[in-house]
Amino acid sequence: MSPKLTEDKNKRKGKNKTILFLYIAVLLFIIWAIATIWLAMTYKLNNKNNEENEVINSAFNKKNPTINFNSEEDKIFENTDRDDLKPPMETVLKDRTLRLKNIKGIFGNMKSPKEISAFHSTFGKEVVYIYHSHSRESFLPYLKDTSRPEEAYHSVANITLVGKMLGRAMDQRGVGTKVETVDIVHLLNSRKLAYTSSYNVSRELVQLSQNENKDLEYFIDIHRDSLRKENTTTEINRTKYASLLFVVGTGHAEYEKNLQFANNLHTLLENRYPALSKGILKKSSSQGNGIYNQDISPNSLIIEIGGVDNTVEELHRSTEALAEVLSDYYWEENSESR
């Protein structure tokens, strides 16, 4: 091969190498540019999310300034400013016009959304006692002439209808349950007592039932919250439920046993119905009654089901969920007697 041809061939090889290097350089530049843009966008997005979280947290803190968590877990907390409502008796005694005439029938006809098969039974024994220290706590959707939480009281459309729903759901699961429907407000009025004596009067009923029936093991005082709907409603699988809140009084020596009972139920609810339970509220004697008849039994609790704005459908779903958990807990604790 002539020297000239060899020289031309070498030149072409050199030129091809140069073009290849240029292609590689351009490709590396494009990759670098894409990576830089991606990192910049990611950084910007993270900053935006952090700012949004700060705004949300700030808004939550402003909206709920009284909640002070006092344990390693957020489920148990104290609320130092949330005293028991102390409405005047004339407010509680006033019967407002109902939006629906057959309110008892509406609550009473709510059916379980699924077929319940009771694998166990207490065989006629009543082992759960449900009562209502604030028996006239009502729900604004069913009261015609008010939208104020402090006026949500009624002699018929009240929390006792929710207690009955819970009692029926417990019975369906084989756990014999007595639902106390005595109107505490009527007893207070007949004795000329203030609303603050509600727990003293309901205590008499609890002790009377306890003396008459030695089989009673669980004592559940059902209430509704006075907070508005955004604080008493949760959504599970796109379905709205009335939130649950356990209240434990710390004004007696053995309250930690009640706290453990509440914690057990809360944990079971979290496993099956996440976020249905808002947690456990500890209340001392400086914040209200402080005992709430819970010194009678370690299995005694206040359970708030929903609030002033919740509907019968939301309340019913929550009583079904609570009955499922409470009945399973009962059978687990009494497994030897099955």
Labelled PLM ranges:
Residues 1-18:
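N-terminal Lys/Arg-rich, disordered targeting/topogenic segments
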Residues 2, 37-126, 338:
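N-terminal, intrinsically disordered, polar/charged segments of Gram-positive cell-envelope systems
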Residues 22-36:
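Hydrophobic membrane-insertion alpha-helices, especially the h-region
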Residues 122-193:
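Active-site histidine-acidic residue metal-binding/catalytic motifs
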Residues 133, 205-248:
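Active-site microenvironments of hydrolase-like enzyme catalytic domains
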Residues 135-138, 183-187, 224-229, 251-254, ...:
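Solvent-exposed loop/turn segments at secondary-structure junctions
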Residues 258-282:
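Active-site-adjacent substrate-binding region
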Residues 280-338:
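Active-site-adjacent mobile loop/cap segments within catalytic or ligand-binding domains
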